């Protein structure tokens, strides 16, 4: 049984339908990427999973349980971690306070979980009292991921984690995601930086105009002439 399974998903915002029958699945321990052009519906697919886009049809199951249409908080409580593309930290709060907010499901911030995430992102441990809004873009992204990992979710959803980062920081960000996955967290990522995402992931899905176009192992998609020509710039 897949940890996450999406079948024939239709979703959107208000009366605007964006997805038209999208299918995807993520097995426990996998690292899966969703790529495609702007407006393909990549982020909408992820937001539908976490309850932030309107569910208009189809199935979404997490760990065998139907979560389609549930409020976001209920989905997070079931063990889905989510990091949105923007506005993903509390800028006026400190690093430590942001991490503490991530522990709301646990009641407090256990030392063990704090140590685990700071081992993953040691630079955050060097500045616990710094306001999140004063961190660099890359550091804010690390803080957002660290906060999402505090409750120890089995599945982590990342929406465009490299967006807005300087080119030399993109590979570093993907290194962090690799290590998160290597520690046993299942990862589903939406990424505009398609070549890097497909090179790093186990499997990938290519969406266009709200529909599935291709699905295969990451390396296979990278080497597919049609995928390269249509979606990867040749």
Label for each model-derived stretch:
Residues 14, 95-112, 120-122, 234:
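ABC-type ATPase nucleotide-binding domains, specifically the catalytic core motifs of the NBD
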Residues 35-37:
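The feature captures the beta-strand-to-loop junction immediately N-terminal to the Walker
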Residues 50:
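Helix-to-loop junction immediately C-terminal to a conserved catalytic motif
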Residues 58-67, 78, 112-114, 216:
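Conserved ABC transporter NBD signature motif
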Residues 148-149:
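ABC ATPase C-loop
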Residues 152:
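Conserved catalytic motifs of ABC-family nucleotide-binding domains
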């Amino acid at each position: 049984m897949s940890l996450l399974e999406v079948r024939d998903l239709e979703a959107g915002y208000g009366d605007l339908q964006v997805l038209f029958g999208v299918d995807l699945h993520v097995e426990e321990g996998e690292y899966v990427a969703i790529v495609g052009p702007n407006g393909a519906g990549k982020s909408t697919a992820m937001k539908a999973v976490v309850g932030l886009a309107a569910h208009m049809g189809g199935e979404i199951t997490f760990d065998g349980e139907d979560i389609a249409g549930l409020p976001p908080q209920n989905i997070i409580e079931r063990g889905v971690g989510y990091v949105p593309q923007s506005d993903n930290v509390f800028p006026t709060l400190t690093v430590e306070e942001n991490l503490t907010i991530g522990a709301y499901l646990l009641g407090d911030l256990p030392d063990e979980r704090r140590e685990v995430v700071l081992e993953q992102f040691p630079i955050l441990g060097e500045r616990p009292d710094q306001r999140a809004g004063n961190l660099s873009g890359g550091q804010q992204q690390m803080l957002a991921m660290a906060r999402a990992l505090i409750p120890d979710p089995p599945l982590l959803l990342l929406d465009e984690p490299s967006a807005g980062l300087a080119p030399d920081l993109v590979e570093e960000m993907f290194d962090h995601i690799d290590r998160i996955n290597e520690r046993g967290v299942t990862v589903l990522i939406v990424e505009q930086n398609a070549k890097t995402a497909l090179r790093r992931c186990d499997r990938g899905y290519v969406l266009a105009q709200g529909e599935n176009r291709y699905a295969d192992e990451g390396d296979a998609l990278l080497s597919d002439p049609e995928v390269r020509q249509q979606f990867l710039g040749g």
